[in-house]
Amino acid sequence: MAMLGTALRPSATRVMLLGSGELGKEVAIECQRLGIEVIAVDRYADAPAMQVAHRSHVINMLDGAALKKLVAQEMPDFIVPEIEAIATDALVELEQQGQRVVPTARAARLTMNREGIRRLAAEELGLPTSAYRFAENEAEFREAVAEIGLPCIVKPVMSSSGKGQSFIRSEEMLESAWQYAQQGGRAGAGKVIVEGVVKFDFEITLLTISAVDGVHFCAPIGHRQEDGDYRESWQPQQMSDVALTRAQEIAQKVVEALGGYGLFGVELFVCGDEVIFSEVSPRPHDTGMVTLISQDLSEFALHVRAFLGLPVGGIRQYGPAASAVILPTLKSDDVKFGELSGALGAGLQLRLFGKPEIDGSRRLGVALATGETVDDAIARAKASAAAVIVKG
């Protein structure tokens, strides 16, 4: 049985968050509910999770020496990555020295870039995926596109939220797509993946939890993407029993191969009864923010419960629910939100992330809604998000 200490006391159970965005903030809050001492880390000050942590630090998390020095200073019981852009070699070394990395350092290393996880899924586990090629320079990139065929998709092997991604329809787009991919990688210029276009009816995120009492699944989450980033998500996504069983089988294989305890966001394409693996994040997923209103245990609560070695038991899904992002475009280091009364009502909630600044378009919050049907919940969430006025 897991023993939890008390924050700010000698017995404290300490969790170090590597990445302190909106997802990390919710993880920090769930840790706080259990009296856990939270140390939030990011590359910039006043990040969302830092605002609800006991302590915070600003470092370059791609600097392995700086990361190891901070871990030696804080001596956390759990190191919890929230983003991909981390010195994963340092995590592997720390784990070998006895530190607990959530879910495992291997999972963090394999999923920090698309090459590691794609090779695991397609080549080691034999799971169905899109056709793909990797390229390290422009000549290899053009060759990969020729092999895959048009249209195709190019992504930096290490990026998130759609950064550096392009949908290539013609050869005239190749040069600009290559340059955009080189600018959008989280660790700078480098290798890309070229993917064939998959025919699918919809995409899902299957939140899969590996815990002391086994593997658990949340109801499938549907979502709409725009410019590579999610705009709305909803739960449950309707799908055939055959497809759901296949999705769960794929997700369980991936999660068990990565190892460790925690929640994983497994992304899948669904076409009829067929299911194709896309990606996996070994941590809460942005599309899973809908679970803040759709389940008795949110994805964040499930992640914390799992990595602490506590049983999940069961997950209750309340019915149709949706999330819609609040995505303004402006420049300010003093953001204010207005017209909130028009955004709230029965079955409506808001989460405003507390990001310290914005320069361009940035996700600053999310509206959450329940409804009679999924379509009703989506419409209510979108209307709530649209009602929020954001000013600098």
UniProtKB/Swiss-Prot annotation:
GO terms for molecular function: ATP binding; magnesium ion binding; phosphoribosylglycinamide formyltransferase 2 activity; phosphoribosylglycinamide formyltransferase activity. Belongs to the PurK/PurT family. Its EC number is 6.3.1.21. N(1)-(5-phospho-beta-D-ribosyl)glycinamide binds at E22, L23, E82, D286, K355, R362, R363. ATP binds at R114, K155, S160, S161, G162, K163, G164, Q165, E195, G196, V197, V198, E203. The gene is purT. GO terms for biological process: 'de novo' IMP biosynthetic process. One of its GO terms (cellular component) is cytosol. Pathway: Purine metabolism; IMP biosynthesis via de novo pathway; N(2)-formyl-N(1)-(5-phospho-D-ribosyl)glycinamide from N(1)-(5-phospho-D-ribosyl)glycinamide (formate route): step 1/1. SUPFAM superfamilies: Glutathione synthetase ATP-binding domain-like, PreATP-grasp domain, Rudiment single hybrid motif. It is an enzyme of class 6 (ligase). PANTHER family: FORMATE-DEPENDENT PHOSPHORIBOSYLGLYCINAMIDE FORMYLTRANSFERASE. Homodimer. PROSITE patterns: ATP_GRASP (PS50975). It catalyses: N(1)-(5-phospho-beta-D-ribosyl)glycinamide + formate + ATP = N(2)-formyl-N(1)-(5-phospho-beta-D-ribosyl)glycinamide + ADP + phosphate + H(+). Keywords: ATP-binding, Ligase, Magnesium, Metal-binding, Nucleotide-binding, Purine biosynthesis. Involved in the de novo purine biosynthesis. Catalyzes the transfer of formate to 5-phospho-ribosyl-glycinamide (GAR), producing 5-phospho-ribosyl-N-formylglycinamide (FGAR). Formate is provided by PurU via hydrolysis of 10-formyl-tetrahydrofolate. It comes from Cronobacter sakazakii (strain ATCC BAA-894). This is Formate-dependent phosphoribosylglycinamide formyltransferase. InterPro entries: ATP-grasp, ATP-grasp_carboxylate-amine, ATP_grasp_subdomain_1, PreATP-grasp_dom_sf, PurT, PurT/PurK_preATP-grasp, PurT_C, Rudment_hybrid_motif. Residues 119-308 form the ATP-grasp domain.
